[in-house]
Regions:
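Conserved alpha-helix/loop element of class I SAM-dependent methyltransferases that forms part
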Residues: 97-132, 142, 146
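N-terminal auxiliary segments of SAM/dcSAM-dependent transferases
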Residues: 2-98, 104
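Class I SAM-dependent methyltransferase SAM/SAH-binding core
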Residues: 127-188, 193, 208
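Conserved catalytic/acceptor-binding region of the Class I
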Residues: 201, 222-317, 321
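C-terminal lobe and adjacent flexible extensions of AdoMet/dcAdoMet transferase-like proteins
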Residues: 3-9, 278-367
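Conserved beta-strand elements of beta-rich interaction domains across eukaryotes
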Residues: 84-85, 90-92, 138-141, 161-164, ...
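Short SAM/SAH-binding signature in class I
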Residues: 189-198, 224
Length: 367
């Protein structure tokens, strides 16, 4: 069994605050520029493709095997209560909206995690000369763009189910449409680093995800996974069992069971277990408590909490909507009232809520 290290950073934060995102059908896509921590990207050059022998423009699409059929219907969005979601065709339904409101929330969450890591984009000890990077479930692409800016010598590829990424990107960054749950078509030993973040409720087989990442990595390469728990907690009992925050988390966990795509990655320790099963070594774990709201006395944690609350409130209804229809199955008007109650609860200065989160990185053994 691989050694697991509890990183010392996981113990630095006070108990009241913090302790402690595959490859196939390719196409670069467009969306509004990020709203938080914006970079100054340039128009992308023609990007190199996976096998270096079939052209792939940074503003166009081509296809590859296995998941290539995704490309024919990527814009065939489904609409739920006026919000757009990724197409259900090909069995790749995802619970989050893919419209501008939700995307802004995702970008704010990126800012939260960057603040949490003291301005860093990763926890793994990466070489500055890193060459090829994969961002699985890239979302708006903000992490991939920022990473490409910070590591101009690296080729950064972000993959997602929805084409919501920006057109204007650094020349060393590109985006591809892909379902990470389908067999990966990357040749073995392609990447130096694979970044996986906030895929809760979207992966049915976490061990398989890490096995595919293991195969796609070069010997000595790193995989990194950052996932929140599906819960709102408090150390002083201010988040009660009947709180709307608690009931919201319970709804998500139940929805994960019903869909077969768990929200319990943190509580079930799926990151560490999956990495161990895949064959990774030097597994390092960092646990965090991200405050919800500005309640912590520590200025940095208070700022993080403000942004976290802003991220949640930015699209609280959109974040609830899919699971509400799946689990609760009551009129949408009731969901909106429930969202109001959750928002009100978060804003109470006496509620000291936080969300447990876990960053895990590990290395593929040298050949």
């Amino acid at each position: 069994m691989a050694d697991v290290t509890q990183a010392p950073e996981a113990q630095r934060q006070p108990a009241s605050a913090t302790t402690g995102e595959a490859s196939a059908s390719t196409k670069t896509w467009g969306a509004p520029a990020p709203v938080i921590v914006p970079s100054e990207p340039q128009e992308s050059n023609e990007a190199s493709n996976r096998d270096d022998d079939d052209a792939d423009s940074s503003l166009g699409y081509d296809t590859a095997s296995t998941t290539a059929s995704l490309s024919s219907s990527i814009m065939d969005y489904r609409t739920i209560h006026g919000r757009t979601y990724h197409s259900e065709k090909h069995g790749t339904a995802y619970w989050g909206p893919n419209d501008e409101r939700q995307n802004e929330a995702l970008d704010i969450s990126h800012h939260v995690l960057t603040l949490l890591l003291d301005g860093k984009l990763h926890g793994a000890p990466l070489n500055k000369n890193i060459q090829k990077v994969l961002d699985v479930g890239t979302g708006t692409g903000i992490w991939a763009v920022d990473f490409a800016d910070e590591y101009p010598g690296a080729q950064v590829i972000g993959t997602d189910l929805s084409p919501i990424q920006p057109y204007w990107i650094p020349p060393n960054c590109k985006f591809e449409i892909d379902d990470a749950e389908l067999p990966w078509t990357w040749p073995e030993g392609t990447f130096d680093y694979i970044h996986i973040r906030y895929l809760l409720g979207s992966i049915s087989d976490w061990p398989q995800l890490f096995k595919q990442a293991f195969a796609a990595l070069k010997p000595g390469g790193y995989v990194e996974s950052f996932e929140p728990d599906a819960s709102f907690e408090s150390d002083d009992g201010s988040v009660t069992p009947d709180s709307p925050l608690t009931r919201w988390a319970q709804m998500n966990r139940e929805g994960g069971k019903m869909s077969g795509k768990p929200f319990t990655i943190y509580s079930d320790n799926l990151q560490v277990q999956g990495m161990q099963e895949a064959g990774f070594t030097d597994i390092t774990v960092k646990n965090f408590k991200i405050p919800v709201g500005p309640w912590p006395a520590d200025p940095k944690l208070s700022e993080i909490g403000q942004y976290e609350q802003y991220a949640i409130e930015q699209d609280i209804e959109g974040t609830m909507m899919f699971m509400w229809d799946l689990v609760i199955q009551k009129p949408i008007e009731e969901m909106r009232l429930f969202a109001m109650s959750a928002r009100k609860e978060m804003r109470k200065p006496t509620v000291h809520a936080y969300i447990p989160q876990r960053l895990v990185y590990a290395r593929k053994p040298e050949a």
